[in-house]
């Protein structure tokens, strides 16, 4: 409804204030991003200049990386293996830390199972970390009993929860790797399982966060691999 008098004036004034605030926030955001880029370039220059000291002193190196993290700059973005900036072991150590952080942040979403492909294409996409780098880094995590590497149809996955996957769960994930989901009828058609066995395995995987259940697809519930859903978000 159109406003008249003082109410209309207040509405117009509020609209102008909102526009001004939005413009100021956008300008500040651009300025902050530009300042961060400049500061990151300066940090790289500093690291190159003092590279020998950084390599020689773990304490100096640790403080430098902590400073980077505290201001929102990922230390991985500063590594340059071609120019021997820091050491290769430091690079893999930082990748390990980031993998652990990613597993912790996504555990409630994927039940503690994440593919190497998702790690590379989604979480490390902007950091120039390849599959070989991930494999070498994650190999360093094998000493931690809660990390395990396994394969499904030739693709590598990382499990970061102490509960091992059962053979039934692995077979269900194999089907999910093809279609993105599984169901009681799919398991019966492909594996010959009875409905009780299928529902028990599927419900347990839902409870552990390995699958998400969807009742909207039709008469039968579908059990989705979370990575197929999150990649569309």
Curated annotation (Swiss-Prot):
UniProt keyword annotations, A-Z: Coiled coil, Cytoplasm, Endosome, Membrane, Protein transport, Transport
Descriptive protein name: Vacuolar-sorting protein SNF8
Stated role: Component of the endosomal sorting complex required for transport II (ESCRT-II), which is required for multivesicular body (MVB) formation and sorting of endosomal cargo proteins into MVBs. The MVB pathway mediates delivery of transmembrane proteins into the lumen of the lysosome for degradation. The ESCRT-II complex is probably involved in the recruitment of the ESCRT-III complex.
Compartments where found: Cytoplasm; Endosome membrane
Family membership noted in the UniProt record: Belongs to the SNF8 family.
GO cellular component terms attached to this protein's record: ESCRT II complex
Coiled-coil segments on the chain, per record: 23-46
Membrane association type: Peripheral membrane protein
Gene symbol of the encoding locus: SNF8
Organism lineage string: Eukaryota, Fungi, Dikarya, Ascomycota, Saccharomycotina
The keyword Protein transport is assigned to this record: yes
């Amino acid at each position: 409804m159109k406003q008249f008098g003082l109410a209309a004036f207040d509405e117009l004034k509020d609209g102008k204030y909102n526009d001004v605030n939005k413009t100021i926030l956008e300008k500040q955001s651009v300025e902050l991003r530009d300042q961060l880029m400049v500061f990151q370039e300066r940090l790289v220059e500093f690291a190159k200049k003092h590279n020998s000291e950084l390599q020689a002193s773990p304490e100096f190196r640790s403080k430098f990386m902590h400073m980077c993290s505290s201001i929102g700059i990922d230390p991985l973005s500063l590594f340059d293996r071609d120019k021997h900036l820091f050491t290769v072991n430091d690079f893999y150590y930082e990748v390990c830390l980031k993998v652990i952080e990613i597993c912790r942040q996504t555990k409630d979403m994927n039940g503690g199972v994440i593919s190497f492909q998702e790690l590379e294409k989604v979480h490390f996409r902007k950091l120039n970390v390849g599959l070989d780098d991930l494999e070498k880094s994650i190999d360093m995590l094998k000493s931690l009993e809660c990390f395990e590497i396994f394969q499904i149809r030739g693709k590598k996955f990382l499990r970061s929860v102490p509960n091992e996957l059962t053979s039934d769960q692995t077979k269900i994930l194999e089907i999910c790797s093809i279609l993105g989901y599984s169901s009681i009828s799919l398991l019966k058609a492909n594996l010959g399982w009875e409905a009780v066995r299928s529902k028990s395995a599927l419900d347990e995987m839902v409870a552990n966060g390995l699958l998400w259940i969807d009742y909207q697809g039709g008469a039968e519930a579908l059990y989705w691999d979370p990575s197929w859903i999150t990649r569309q978000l």
